[in-house]
Amino acid sequence: VANKYTGSNEVGGTSGSGNLFLEISQGKVSGYSVVHKFGRNDEIDTATDPEDVWTYGGLYTYNDTPSIQYISSDNALDIGMEITVEGLDENYEEQSVTVLLNGQTQTQIGTGELFVRVFRAFTSGPIAFAGNVLIYDDTVVSVTLGVPSPSTSVKAEIRAEDQQTYMALYTVPAGKTAYFMQHSSDITKPNSSAQNAVMDIRVREFGGVFRSKQLDGLTTDGSSSFDFVFTLPEMIPEKSDIRMQVRTVSTNDMGVSSTFVLILVDNSVA
């Protein structure tokens, strides 16, 4: 494949005048797809860093044992809202299951489908929910007013103001290779004094450990952003975990958001 990342339309020996990235997004290029992940963490303290960039906060707990997932809201009136949960099944293949909320009641997602990863969920029906929705695995011990315990069982959170997860984490499906194209991060602080944070892109290949791929220093007099486009995209193999993590912050109550873009390529055409 020539000029795969230049924007020219050359795939599998076919050349044209269109934009390759646009055509991938439109689903016109067989075996190629785009993943856009985004997340935020609204409160990171000097005593709690490092933290991952997801609304639930703290470090994300991975469970490599495939398990049934559950869902509940902390609002008892959130009944009948349709939620779609996306992740990977026990074979690390892409899986999407739809479930209806039942208020604060622990509700099984699906009819026995197992998830080894959950990395996105959103309201897919016509009615928005009012509480905060949590998705958690079978390591849960108890659920009180819709909130599971221990917190390490939580695999995703959807806040009412978003109706969509904000979690800058992803796992590459089996049979695919990810190409890390771009990432951006920003920090906010409600005062005018300069603050700073260190962002860390961390990747764990299947069977390995998390390794730091890039550190980005952010500084702010109220807000700051950092954008990086890979001239030569980073190749990430199947079943690898990707997490955007805040390594350190200089002050308490730091808010951080991150986003990254991947191109997924089927291994059969890579």
Model-based region annotation:
Residues 3-117, 122-270:
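Beta-strand-centric surfaces of beta-sandwich/beta-rich domains
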